[in-house]
Amino acid sequence: MNTLLTFSLFLLLTLSLAGSSMADYKATVFNNLPGNANLTVHCQSAGSDLGTQTITYLHDFSWTVSNLLNCDMSWGNVKGNFDIFDPKRDASRCAYGNTCFWRVKEDGLYLFIQEHKRLELQFKWPGN
Ligand SMILES: *[C@@H]1O[C@H](CO)[C@@H](O)[C@H](O)[C@H]1NC(C)=O
């Protein structure tokens, strides 16, 4: 076989493998709480503090992640801590267009599960 062709194929394969291992995902949080409540979200990923976001009613915010994304969330006097992206758990189950879509409601956090094509309750607010 032509050496140049073999080398080109090798290079192409290496580049595509390297590309897929560095895949970025998007974690989106949509505020669907009652009473126009604001949702406060404070996330950390891979030892970095990503700051605090206030997501107003019927708005969303997205983080681009490739590692675990852990967030403190609160509204009114309700508080919780959730892993909203975990590459082992989520890379295939919620990666619709590489996006983990969360809808935050009064009873808890719903995730769009690609295989079931619907939102499913994953985490309840503590105490609920
Ligand atoms: C939500 O936040 C916005 C902007 O930070 C603020 O103007 C609004 O009053 C807040 N709404 C409630 C219900 O606390």
Model-derived regions, located:
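Intrinsically disordered, low-complexity segments enriched in small/polar residues
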Residues: 2-63, 72-128
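Exposed beta-strand face motif in extracellular beta-rich ectodomains
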Residues: 67-69
